């Protein structure tokens, strides 16, 4: 089964542009996941949209950084990038660490989603309880739990965060505490029903 692990970096939190996206396509069989494709690009804010200073503090994606990393033969804006849609056409299963946020920016509906943060809250029992509940695990908490090496200087880059999320997902594939959630996620669906924007 094909699964896509992805992450976005955006120009704010709501009603804003995608500045960077990274997606890794996997072939998942049992407890094994093999990388079979990758998509990674940078984009500019939509016309008339100013750079969000608070977002820059998190992701560091200034206009200069985007100019440096952007290829001139690629679409300027994420909404114009049909190649990303094509990259995603053969799967209906998506993984992200905060998928409720990231999926808002995709140009199609996700049918099957797996949130490593949400599942992690149920299985990792991260310390520092709030309101008698375990806290949501950050990407770094989940990485530490599954013994994934980290470089904190690279956090909040779509490419690096996707790679870390991928390794966490691989760990979860083998985790008996996640088996029930994983089985539900990996059920077969009809790809033709995916609501892609063309």
Q: What residue spans do the PLM features occupy?
A:
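Conserved non-catalytic scaffold segment of RNase H-like nuclease domains
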Residues: 2-110, 133-146, 152
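Short alpha-helix plus adjacent loop in nuclease-associated cores
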Residues: 114-134
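Acidic, Mg2+-coordinating catalytic module of metal-dependent nucleases/exonucleases
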Residues: 93-100, 104-105, 138-198
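Short aromatic-enriched loop/helix-cap "lid" or pocket-rim segments at secondary-structure transitions
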Residues: 51-54, 125-126, 193-194
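Ser/Thr-centric signal marking residues that sit
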Residues: 8-11, 116, 165
């Amino acid at each position: 089964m094909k699964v896509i692990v992805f992450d976005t970096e955006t120009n704010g939190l709501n009603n804003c542009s995608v500045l960077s996206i990274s997606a890794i396509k996997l072939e998942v069989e049992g407890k094994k996941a093999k990388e079979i494709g990758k998509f990674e690009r940078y984009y500019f804010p939509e016309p008339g949209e100013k750079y969000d200073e608070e977002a820059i503090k998190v992701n560091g994606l200034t206009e200069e950084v985007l100019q440096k990393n952007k290829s001139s033969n690629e679409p300027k804006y994420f909404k114009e990038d049909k190649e990303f849609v094509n990259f995603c056409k053969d799967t209906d299963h998506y993984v992200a660490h905060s998928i409720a946020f990231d999926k808002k920016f995709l140009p199609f509906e996700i049918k099957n989603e797996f949130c490593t943060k949400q599942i992690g809250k149920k299985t990792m029992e991260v310390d520092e309880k709030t309101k008698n509940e375990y806290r949501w695990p950050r990407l770094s908490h989940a990485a530490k739990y599954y013994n994934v090496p980290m470089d904190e200087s690279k956090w909040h880059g779509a490419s690096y965060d996707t790679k870390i999320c991928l390794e966490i997902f691989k760990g979860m594939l083998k985790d008996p505490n996640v088996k029930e959630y994983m089985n539900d996620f990996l059920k077969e669906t009809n790809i033709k029903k995916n609501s892609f924007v063309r």
